[in-house]
């Protein structure tokens, strides 16, 4: 499934692969070039983000924010699980609040 999330920016959901664990993977592409990926878990009651990785040469362009904005439009409850210390300002900036030391939550 390809979903446009910004000018030239697409989020592409990949099929689950058991050898990669029980995760839903998304590629982030800009004009057909992969610029990052997201590792999530989609469940009926919640959507969990384990990581959003934008490749270093593409950082600072708002791509991670565009991914989160899309997820926020689609899901009423999002958990950012295993948030690293250096990533906390990003999650706070996009509207998440800390529930525990490494888990941030966004609710509609």
Give the residues covered by each predicted segment.
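Conserved GNAT acetyl-CoA-binding A-motif
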Residues: 73-86
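Conserved beta-hairpin
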Residues: 16, 21-36
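Conserved active-site tyrosine of GNAT-family acetyltransferases
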Residues: 91, 96
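Conserved acetyl-CoA-binding loop-helix of GNAT-fold acetyltransferases
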Residues: 54, 60-73
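Conserved acetyl-CoA binding element of GNAT-fold acetyltransferases
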Residues: 45-56
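Conserved catalytic-core motifs of GNAT/GCN5-like acyltransferases
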Residues: 79-81, 97-108
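Conserved N-terminal entry element of GNAT/NAT acetyltransferase domains
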Residues: 1-14
């Amino acid at each position: 499934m390809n979903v446009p999330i910004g000018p030239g920016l697409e989020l592409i959901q990949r099929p689950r692969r058991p050898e990669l664990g029980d995760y839903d993977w998304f590629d982030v592409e800009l004009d057909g070039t992969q610029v990052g990926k997201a590792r999530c878990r989609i469940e009926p009651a919640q959507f969990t983000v384990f990581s959003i990785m934008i490749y270093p040469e593409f950082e600072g362009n708002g791509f991670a924010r565009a991914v989160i904005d899309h997820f926020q439009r689609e899901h009423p409850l999002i958990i950012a699980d295993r948030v690293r210390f250096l990533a906390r300002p990003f999650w706070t900036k996009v509207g998440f609040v800390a529930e525990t030391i490494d888990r941030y939550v966004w609710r509609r």
